[in-house]
From Swiss-Prot:
The gene is panC. The active site is at H33. (R)-pantoate binds at Q57, Q149. The reaction proceeds by a bi uni uni bi ping pong mechanism. It comes from Nitrosomonas europaea (strain ATCC 19718 / CIP 103999 / KCTC 2705 / NBRC 14298). Keywords: ATP-binding, Cytoplasm, Ligase, Nucleotide-binding, Pantothenate biosynthesis. This is Pantothenate synthetase. It is found in: Cytoplasm. NCBIfam families: panC.
Amino acid sequence: MEIITDIAPLRARLRHEASVAFVPTMGNLHAGHLSLVRIAQKHASCSVVSIFVNRLQFAPHEDFDRYPRTWSDDCRLLEEQGADIVFMPDEKTLYPVPQEFQLLLPPVADTLEGACRPGFFRGVTTVVLKLFNIVQPHIAVFGEKDYQQLQVVHRMVDQLNLPVEIIAGETVRDEDGLALSSRNNYLDATQRQEAGELAHHLKQIRDSIASGERDFPLLEQLAAEKLSKRGWVVDYVAVRQQHTLLPVAASDSSLVILGAAWLNQTRLIDNFLLTLP
C-alpha cells in the first residue's frame, strides 16, 4: 500500500491505471468504511482511499477540532484490507488559497441536514469535487448512512457531467442496530447503551408503513416524542421520497425514513429505506 500526500505524485501514480475506484473519508475508520473499500476493490483495478478532515463542512461551533484523528490506525486497517493507495493531503494541499469558488446547491440540499447545518453541503460538495478532479476516479463509493449527502453527490455528478459512477454501500450496524459512525466514539458507556434507540424508532416507522400505516406526520411526531422523553434532542424525524427527499405523496412507493438527534453532546443520524409494492 502506498501513502501519498501530494497531488502531482498521486496523478502520476494513477495515470496508467486501467480503472480507479475512490472512497473519500475523514478518517477514524471503522467497519463501515472498510465495507466501502471492499466494494471499491470489486469494481476497479486500483482502490484509492482519501483521509482528510474537511474544515469547510464544519460550522464554527461544531466539532472540527475534536473530530477523531487516528491516522496510524487508519493506515493499518487499510493495509490489512488491501487498499492500494491512501491519499492524505494536508489543508494547504487541498486549499492553498482561500476557497472562493463554490457550487450553487440544488433544493435537495436545503432540507433536513441542510437546514440543521447551514453550509454543510457546500463544504461537502466543494471537497468532493476537488477530490474527484485530483483522483479522477472511474467509480466512487459513498455510504447510505449519509443518505442525503449521497443524493447531493449524485446530483452534482449528473448535472455537471462528471465522468464518475457513484456506488452506494449499505449501512453497517452494531448488534443493537446503531449505525457505525466515527462520532460514536464520543459516547460514554451509558450513552452507548441508549444510542440504538434512534435506529429502533426509525425502524418502527418503516415497519408501520410496510404494514399499511399512511399517517406519516403522526408517525414522525410519535417517534420524536418517544426520543424526547428518553432525553434526546431531536433535529428531525422525517418520511421522505427517496430521490427528491420531498414529503411523500400518496403515489410514492420509494421511501426513506430519516432521523437526526442529539444524545447529550453527540449528534447521530440514521435512515432506513423502504420500497412499497
